């Protein structure tokens, strides 16, 4: 069997795993599987398109756009990426909102790294109100709440993140900590 054929088969297997994980809302697991798929076959537009959809779902719009543009460049005809890009551009203010969310997240991360947790918390609170599907922001806000020992607020953020990405390992870990400290551990 030729290497190219074998690589495509492995890529398809990882794509199928990613598709199943996405269907069960294990979006972080799906991202991992789809990235592996693309390592074996970078021309697999179905994997790129699904990866873009997942990135968009978890609030990482820039990464979603990147995957769809690459996909469209690889296959110009009969490609769903064209429709996805059209829908994102047609949604009034969506790209601007996503861009502002990413900037606020990065600023909050800098605040948190420089021991300015209050400003980071305030910025993230406003951000997740405007852009609640940004899982990383929910996760960082919950982590700040955990550090401040406000386990109930942390649990609320983590619950919102788990509604989007049901099996995110870090969110599940932080949720265990929050539950343990609120007495709600199972």
Feature names for model-found ranges:
Residues 1-13, 89-103:
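TPR-adjacent "capping" and linker segments in tetratricopeptide-repeat scaffold/adaptor proteins
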Residues 23, 57, 74, 90-94, ...:
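Register position in tetratricopeptide repeats
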Residues 5, 36-39, 70-73, 128-129, ...:
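Conserved structural position within tetratricopeptide repeats
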Residues 4, 11-12, 45-46, 79-80, ...:
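Helix-start (N-cap) detector for alpha-helical repeat units in TPR-like alpha-solenoids
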């Amino acid at each position: 069997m030729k290497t190219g054929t074998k690589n495509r088969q492995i890529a398809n297997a990882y794509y199928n795993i990613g598709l199943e994980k996405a269907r069960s809302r294990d979006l972080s697991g799906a991202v991992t599987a789809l990235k592996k798929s693309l390592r074996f076959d970078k021309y697999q537009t179905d994997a790129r398109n699904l990866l873009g959809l997942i990135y968009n779902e978890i609030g990482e719009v820039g990464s979603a756009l990147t995957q769809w543009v690459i996909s469209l460049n690889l296959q110009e005809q009969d490609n769903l990426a064209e429709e996805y890009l059209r829908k994102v551009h047609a949604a009034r203010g969506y790209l601007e909102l996503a861009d502002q969310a990413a900037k606020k997240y990065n600023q909050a991360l800098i605040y948190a790294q420089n021991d300015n947790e209050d400003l980071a918390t305030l910025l993230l609170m406003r951000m997740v109100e405007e852009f609640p599907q940004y899982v990383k922001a929910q996760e960082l806000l919950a982590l700040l709440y955990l550090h401040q020992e406000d386990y109930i607020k942390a649990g609320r953020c983590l619950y919102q993140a788990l509604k989007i990405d049901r099996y995110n390992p870090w969110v599940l870990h932080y949720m265990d900590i929050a539950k343990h400290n609120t007495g709600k551990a199972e």
